[in-house]
Amino acid sequence: AASLGDFDISLYAPAYSSGFEIFGAEGMKSTILKTYAPWQGAEGEETQLFIARNGEQAPADFPGQVLDGDARRIVCMSSTYIAMLDALGEPQRVVGVSGIDYISNPYVASHKEQIGDVGYDGNMNYERLLSLSPDIVLLFGVSGASAMEPKLRELGIPYAYMGEYLEQSPLGKAEWLVAVAEIAGMRERGEEVFREIPLRYDSLKTLAAKAERKPVVMLNTPYGDSWLMAPPSSYVARLIADAGGQYVYT
């Protein structure tokens, strides 16, 4: 069996994202998806997913989650991952979601009877989750590891952290669709889909830069006594600037 050190071939090093990388080993079909700083304040933290293919085993010293083969039944804890699977032409792989009534994806909206709503991070319906027989749960952490982790380990359901919302550029966020494609066993398709996105984005950015007026933009609505706004370093602020707007915080 291969050792962890054998997985030192970078199969995909993102051009825009700083949150993940995909590694392989000589002569092996299996890959390792590494996620860097997967939640706020997680600098130096790293999570790993071993995607076992061709009957290969994870190295004995592998510290992360193990997915047995390409994921065909996926539970998405954020609607972002649904959009990425849709962009890959594979929305039917979504078997479970969080908060189905708030999801606008056409496939999910038209298949509510077949897709299970598993609840939210702090209030999960694990019986429903188990009944979906998922290959993997795509989840996220906000200010720490997901509260779902211990129970998913107990149930033997693999999970992977998606840190796309922490990216500082819209293209960095979009590039996570390659990570989702790797999990689904279709990285080449993911690279192909993503390749077009920066070209379209940059042409629109150039067009927006010619606008004479830059509207001032605020985000969200008040919640309780607070008005939560994305920081100026976030992908949202970058998106507003690139679209020809002026973020109220900058």
How would you label these PLM feature ranges?
Residues 1-82, 189-218:
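Bacterial Sec-exported substrate-binding components of ABC uptake systems
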Residues 90, 155-156, 243-244:
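Short, structured coil segments at secondary-structure junctions
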Residues 26, 98-101, 119, 163, ...:
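Residues at the C-termini of beta-strands that transition into short coil/loop
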Residues 31-61, 67-130, 136-143:
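A short, structured surface patch at a secondary-structure boundary
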Residues 228-250:
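Alpha-helical, coiled-coil/dimerization segments enriched in small aliphatic residues
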Residues 66-69, 73, 136, 145-226, ...:
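Extracytoplasmic substrate-binding proteins
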Residues 85-89, 148-151, 230-233:
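Short, solvent-exposed loop/turn and secondary-structure capping segments
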